[in-house]
């Protein structure tokens, strides 16, 4: 039965590290729709009709057909009665990241340090100075930072990042200056945090939600006058992009060094696919200028 096939397919892909929460919901809904139509196999006509009925935009329509196509290919390997729906491919688009300058980061930290105190805890300004500083200096995902527990802070300035994207864990070493700032923050935190062991808490001493972090981050951006004249405002996730871009800007442009540095950075960031790291090459004019210069030298025969 198609619903059972969905469970098998999702179970297999999750065993490989994919979470697929939305995909599981979409495919389960599609399978129920197909069964209600009397289908025992994936049919192109049914897939197209379902995707058209539930999609509000061309992009979501394409995404649902892609999900069904991958599912159908999985089933087709076992039973050729299944049909793989056609889906138009459009070039993948990702919003250009906002790369914060050192001056902007300094203004943001200053703005965070001057946030208005909120009862019952005076921790608000300390929390956001540390959170922004940690994200900017380590490239952690915001979800990884908010999920940090006290026992994830290992000796020698290492963070243990547990079961994050693709269900992987990794160790993230920190710069000594970051370790020092984190220890000072924790000393202040102990006086007001209560019993919860999350590193970052909301003012009521409960684990901080992503929504709360983002809301306060936008307050900080406004106070620091960062990105206010843009149609699309900078995101907290852009701190991760900024970290990766600055690291790559400091890399030597020799081919062997670039390959080594990319692998190291991909591991540090927790990327399951190094292609996600290569994307950072497009992030700043400095990187593109370095790449162009290296390419010209290679063409001219100056690089072996």
Give the location of each predicted region:
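Conserved catalytic core of the tyrosine transesterase superfamily
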Residues: 1-304
